[in-house]
Amino acid sequence: MPDHAISTDPAVQAQLDRLWALSPGADVLGLERITRLLNRLGNPQDALPPVFHVAGTNGKGSTSAMIAAGLREAGHRVGLFTSPHLIEPTERIVVDGRAVSTEEFAEAFAAVHKAAERLIETGALDAHPTYFETVTLMAFWWFAKAEVDWAVIEVGLGGRLDATNIVAPQLCVITPVDYDHEAWLGKSLDSIAFEKAGILKTGVPAVLAPQHPVAREVIARSEERRVGKECR
Protein backbone atom coordinates (compact mmCIF):
# COMPACT_ATOMS: atom_id res chain seq x y z
CA MET A 1 0.00 0.00 0.00
CA PRO A 2 1.44 3.46 -0.87
CA ASP A 3 2.88 5.72 1.82
CA HIS A 4 0.00 8.17 1.53
CA ALA A 5 -2.68 5.47 1.99
CA ILE A 6 -5.42 6.45 4.44
CA SER A 7 -7.80 3.53 3.96
CA THR A 8 -7.42 -0.18 4.62
CA ASP A 9 -10.11 -0.87 2.03
CA PRO A 10 -8.31 -1.48 -1.30
CA ALA A 11 -11.30 -0.28 -3.34
CA VAL A 12 -11.52 2.97 -1.39
CA GLN A 13 -7.76 3.49 -1.55
CA ALA A 14 -7.78 2.92 -5.31
CA GLN A 15 -10.18 5.85 -5.72
CA LEU A 16 -8.06 8.04 -3.45
CA ASP A 17 -4.91 7.17 -5.38
CA ARG A 18 -6.55 8.43 -8.56
CA LEU A 19 -7.32 11.73 -6.84
CA TRP A 20 -3.78 12.07 -5.46
CA ALA A 21 -2.49 11.65 -9.01
CA LEU A 22 -4.06 15.01 -9.90
CA SER A 23 -1.65 17.85 -9.16
CA PRO A 24 -3.01 20.20 -6.45
CA GLY A 25 -0.93 22.99 -7.98
CA ALA A 26 -2.26 22.61 -11.52
CA ASP A 27 -4.80 25.42 -11.37
CA VAL A 28 -6.72 26.14 -14.56
CA LEU A 29 -9.20 28.99 -14.34
CA GLY A 30 -12.40 28.81 -16.33
CA LEU A 31 -15.91 27.40 -16.06
CA GLU A 32 -16.32 25.45 -19.31
CA ARG A 33 -14.92 22.15 -18.06
CA ILE A 34 -16.72 22.15 -14.72
CA THR A 35 -19.97 23.11 -16.47
CA ARG A 36 -19.73 20.06 -18.74
CA LEU A 37 -18.96 17.80 -15.80
CA LEU A 38 -21.84 19.17 -13.74
CA ASN A 39 -24.19 18.53 -16.65
CA ARG A 40 -22.95 14.95 -16.76
CA LEU A 41 -23.49 14.59 -13.00
CA GLY A 42 -27.06 15.87 -13.28
CA ASN A 43 -26.23 19.43 -12.13
CA PRO A 44 -26.06 18.74 -8.38
CA GLN A 45 -25.33 22.43 -7.78
CA ASP A 46 -28.91 23.17 -8.84
CA ALA A 47 -30.13 20.92 -6.03
CA LEU A 48 -28.19 22.85 -3.43
CA PRO A 49 -30.13 24.79 -0.81
CA PRO A 50 -29.46 28.49 -0.17
CA VAL A 51 -25.75 29.18 -0.71
CA PHE A 52 -23.37 31.66 0.89
CA HIS A 53 -20.49 32.30 -1.55
CA VAL A 54 -17.35 33.71 0.08
CA ALA A 55 -14.42 35.31 -1.75
CA GLY A 56 -11.56 37.57 -0.67
CA THR A 57 -7.91 37.33 0.27
CA ASN A 58 -7.72 37.49 4.04
CA GLY A 59 -10.06 35.63 6.36
CA LYS A 60 -12.34 33.96 3.83
CA GLY A 61 -11.80 30.51 5.35
CA SER A 62 -12.50 31.65 8.91
CA THR A 63 -15.45 33.75 7.71
CA SER A 64 -16.90 30.71 5.94
CA ALA A 65 -16.44 28.61 9.08
CA MET A 66 -18.13 31.24 11.26
CA ILE A 67 -21.10 31.52 8.90
CA ALA A 68 -21.48 27.74 8.92
CA ALA A 69 -21.21 27.64 12.72
CA GLY A 70 -23.89 30.31 13.07
CA LEU A 71 -26.26 28.45 10.78
CA ARG A 72 -25.69 25.22 12.69
CA GLU A 73 -26.36 27.00 15.97
CA ALA A 74 -29.69 28.12 14.49
CA GLY A 75 -30.58 24.47 13.96
CA HIS A 76 -29.76 24.05 10.27
CA ARG A 77 -27.97 21.18 8.57
CA VAL A 78 -25.00 22.88 6.89
CA GLY A 79 -22.52 21.90 4.21
CA LEU A 80 -19.18 23.74 4.30
CA PHE A 81 -16.61 23.66 1.49
CA THR A 82 -13.21 25.26 2.13
CA SER A 83 -9.65 25.02 0.89
CA PRO A 84 -6.87 24.23 1.37
CA HIS A 85 -6.95 21.50 4.01
CA LEU A 86 -4.64 21.41 7.02
CA ILE A 87 -4.03 17.67 7.45
CA GLU A 88 -6.39 15.51 5.38
CA PRO A 89 -8.23 16.51 2.18
CA THR A 90 -11.48 15.20 3.66
CA GLU A 91 -11.48 18.40 5.78
CA ARG A 92 -12.52 20.36 2.69
CA ILE A 93 -16.03 18.85 2.68
CA VAL A 94 -17.87 19.21 5.98
CA VAL A 95 -21.48 18.44 6.88
CA ASP A 96 -22.84 19.52 10.26
CA GLY A 97 -19.37 20.26 11.58
CA ARG A 98 -17.95 16.85 10.62
CA ALA A 99 -15.57 16.25 7.77
CA VAL A 100 -16.75 13.51 5.44
CA SER A 101 -15.26 10.10 6.08
CA THR A 102 -12.59 8.60 3.85
CA GLU A 103 -15.22 6.26 2.42
CA GLU A 104 -17.63 9.13 1.70
CA PHE A 105 -14.82 11.15 0.13
CA ALA A 106 -13.92 8.20 -2.11
CA GLU A 107 -17.58 7.69 -3.03
CA ALA A 108 -17.89 11.30 -4.15
CA PHE A 109 -14.65 11.05 -6.12
CA ALA A 110 -15.80 7.86 -7.84
CA ALA A 111 -18.93 9.65 -9.10
CA VAL A 112 -16.91 12.59 -10.44
CA HIS A 113 -14.21 10.37 -11.94
CA LYS A 114 -16.79 8.24 -13.72
CA ALA A 115 -18.40 11.34 -15.23
CA ALA A 116 -15.02 12.67 -16.38
CA GLU A 117 -14.02 9.34 -17.93
CA ARG A 118 -17.27 9.18 -19.86
CA LEU A 119 -16.88 12.72 -21.22
CA ILE A 120 -13.29 12.02 -22.24
CA GLU A 121 -14.36 8.82 -24.01
CA THR A 122 -16.98 10.69 -26.03
CA GLY A 123 -14.64 13.57 -26.84
CA ALA A 124 -16.68 16.10 -24.86
CA LEU A 125 -13.72 16.67 -22.51
CA ASP A 126 -10.06 16.81 -23.50
CA ALA A 127 -8.57 16.16 -20.05
CA HIS A 128 -9.46 15.24 -16.50
CA PRO A 129 -10.49 18.11 -14.23
CA THR A 130 -7.85 19.62 -11.98
CA TYR A 131 -7.54 18.64 -8.33
CA PHE A 132 -9.51 21.71 -7.20
CA GLU A 133 -12.18 21.28 -9.86
CA THR A 134 -12.54 17.65 -8.83
CA VAL A 135 -12.92 18.36 -5.11
CA THR A 136 -15.35 21.21 -5.87
CA LEU A 137 -17.48 18.82 -7.91
CA MET A 138 -17.27 16.29 -5.09
CA ALA A 139 -18.53 18.87 -2.59
CA PHE A 140 -21.50 19.83 -4.75
CA TRP A 141 -22.34 16.17 -5.35
CA TRP A 142 -22.04 15.27 -1.67
CA PHE A 143 -24.02 18.25 -0.37
CA ALA A 144 -26.88 17.39 -2.74
CA LYS A 145 -26.75 13.77 -1.58
CA ALA A 146 -26.62 14.79 2.10
CA GLU A 147 -29.61 17.13 1.64
CA VAL A 148 -28.11 19.99 3.61
CA ASP A 149 -30.27 23.01 4.47
CA TRP A 150 -27.54 25.56 3.70
CA ALA A 151 -24.24 25.44 1.85
CA VAL A 152 -21.29 27.72 2.55
CA ILE A 153 -18.86 27.71 -0.37
CA GLU A 154 -15.42 29.31 -0.16
CA VAL A 155 -13.81 30.44 -3.41
CA GLY A 156 -10.53 28.71 -4.19
CA LEU A 157 -8.73 31.28 -6.34
CA GLY A 158 -10.00 34.70 -7.40
CA GLY A 159 -13.72 34.41 -8.01
CA ARG A 160 -14.81 35.30 -11.53
CA LEU A 161 -13.37 32.17 -13.15
CA ASP A 162 -13.11 30.01 -10.03
CA ALA A 163 -14.69 26.56 -10.21
CA THR A 164 -17.06 27.46 -7.37
CA ASN A 165 -18.54 30.36 -9.37
CA ILE A 166 -21.14 28.09 -10.87
CA VAL A 167 -23.47 28.30 -7.87
CA ALA A 168 -26.54 30.53 -7.60
CA PRO A 169 -25.92 32.17 -4.21
CA GLN A 170 -28.40 33.79 -1.87
CA LEU A 171 -25.65 35.95 -0.39
CA CYS A 172 -22.16 36.89 -1.57
CA VAL A 173 -19.40 37.85 0.85
CA ILE A 174 -16.06 39.48 -0.01
CA THR A 175 -13.52 39.58 2.81
CA PRO A 176 -10.55 42.01 2.69
CA VAL A 177 -8.85 41.94 -0.71
CA ASP A 178 -5.06 42.04 -0.90
CA TYR A 179 -2.28 40.85 -3.17
CA ASP A 180 -2.47 37.10 -3.79
CA HIS A 181 -2.13 34.58 -6.63
CA GLU A 182 -0.68 37.34 -8.81
CA ALA A 183 0.34 34.90 -11.55
CA TRP A 184 -3.36 34.18 -12.16
CA LEU A 185 -5.16 37.31 -10.96
CA GLY A 186 -2.79 40.08 -12.03
CA LYS A 187 -0.14 42.10 -10.24
CA SER A 188 -2.24 45.15 -9.38
CA LEU A 189 -4.77 45.45 -6.58
CA ASP A 190 -7.45 46.64 -8.98
CA SER A 191 -7.07 43.58 -11.23
CA ILE A 192 -7.22 41.27 -8.21
CA ALA A 193 -10.30 43.06 -6.85
CA PHE A 194 -11.96 42.78 -10.26
CA GLU A 195 -11.53 39.00 -10.17
CA LYS A 196 -12.89 38.76 -6.61
CA ALA A 197 -15.89 40.90 -7.56
CA GLY A 198 -16.74 38.32 -10.22
CA ILE A 199 -18.79 36.33 -7.69
CA LEU A 200 -21.35 39.14 -7.37
CA LYS A 201 -24.69 38.40 -9.02
CA THR A 202 -27.55 40.63 -10.13
CA GLY A 203 -30.26 40.75 -7.49
CA VAL A 204 -28.16 38.93 -4.88
CA PRO A 205 -27.26 40.81 -1.67
CA ALA A 206 -23.56 41.21 -0.94
CA VAL A 207 -21.63 41.85 2.25
CA LEU A 208 -18.28 43.61 1.89
CA ALA A 209 -15.61 43.70 4.58
CA PRO A 210 -13.67 46.96 5.03
CA GLN A 211 -11.46 47.27 1.94
CA HIS A 212 -8.45 49.16 0.66
CA PRO A 213 -9.86 52.20 -1.21
CA VAL A 214 -8.61 50.85 -4.55
CA ALA A 215 -10.28 47.47 -4.03
CA ARG A 216 -13.49 49.05 -2.76
CA GLU A 217 -13.72 51.34 -5.79
CA VAL A 218 -13.19 48.47 -8.23
CA ILE A 219 -15.81 46.31 -6.51
CA ALA A 220 -18.28 49.22 -6.41
CA ARG A 221 -17.76 49.95 -10.12
CA SER A 222 -18.24 46.28 -10.93
CA GLU A 223 -21.54 46.22 -9.06
CA GLU A 224 -22.65 49.50 -10.65
CA ARG A 225 -22.20 48.00 -14.11
CA ARG A 226 -24.20 44.99 -12.99
CA VAL A 227 -27.17 46.77 -11.43
CA GLY A 228 -27.13 50.00 -13.45
CA LYS A 229 -27.04 52.34 -10.45
CA GLU A 230 -24.48 53.91 -8.16
CA CYS A 231 -23.19 51.69 -5.33
CA ARG A 232 -21.53 53.50 -2.45
What are these regions (language model features)?
Residues 52-54:
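Hydrophobic anchor at the beta1->P-loop junction of P-loop NTPases
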Residues 47-50, 204:
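Pre-Walker A (Motif I) flank of P-loop NTPase domains
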Residues 1-27:
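Charged, amphipathic alpha-helical linker segments immediately N-terminal to NTP-binding catalytic cores
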Residues 63-66:
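Hydrophobic positions on the alpha1 helix immediately C-terminal to the Walker A/P-loop
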Residues 119-123, 147-149, 154, 169-232:
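Acidic, Mg2+-coordinating active-site environments of NTP-dependent enzymes
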Residues 7, 11, 25, 31, ...:
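ATP-dependent carboxylate-amine ligase catalytic core
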